[in-house]
Amino acid sequence: MVEPREQFFQDLLSAVDQQMDTVKNDIKDIMKEKTSFMVSFENFIERYDTMEKNIQDLQNKYEEMAANLMTVMTDTKIQLGAIIAQLEILMINGTPLPAKKTTIKEAMPLPLSNTNNEQTSPPASGKTSETPKKNPTNAMFFTRSEWASSNTFREKFLTPEIQAILDEQFANKTGIERLHAEGLYMWRTQFSDEQKKMVKEMMKK
């Protein structure tokens, strides 16, 4: 027969063993959860790295598109300035610049517009006009720096009277912005309907 004291220790050891088994099982569960968490965390890090790379790629593409857009806008402004400048030359000189495959002798004079501004008349009966003209140099031979300078262009092609009108209208503008504004103003106010029609026909060639 087991003595009470010995039975007590046996029961105590059995309880301790059961408690140890419980602790071991809890530790196993914790390790499984840790492993699962680490896998999930690694997957998250991988997705984050992929997302960060995609964001960087998008940013690079955006910067490239912005640079390309700025280049296109600059070139467009220069080309628009060239077109506006040639329209002003047409109005001031009364003779269109030669179109492609057309010689200067073949170019027909534009009719005078109904304005109070002084404009030169096309030569008649082989006689040259007594009114002094501005230099009709083809504006397409201008350099980019000249396109950017409204004053350079205006001194070469515009009469003092028209320059005074434009100075009053666009005193707050400079450079290409002013050149565009002057060209649009003159196109809208100085060109006759017939002149506009002829210019549009020329630009289609």
Curated annotation (Swiss-Prot):
Lineage top rank: taxon: Viruses
Induction conditions: Expressed in the early phase of the viral replicative cycle.
Keywords associated with the record: Activation of host autophagy by virus, Coiled coil, Host cytoplasm, Host-virus interaction
UniProt-annotated location(s): Host cytoplasm
Signal peptide: none
GO cellular component: host cell cytoplasm
Segments forming a coiled coil: 10-75
Disulfide bond entries: none
Ranges of Polar residues composition bias in the record: 112-138
Region (Disordered): 111-138
Any one Gene Ontology BP term: symbiont-mediated activation of host autophagy
Family per record: Belongs to the asfivirus K205R family.
Function description: Induces host endoplasmic reticulum stress and consequently activates autophagy and NF-kappa-B signaling pathway. In turn, may induce autophagy-mediated STING1 degradation and innate immune evasion.
Protein name: Uncharacterized protein K205R
Lineage: Viruses, Varidnaviria, Bamfordvirae, Nucleocytoviricota, Pokkesviricetes
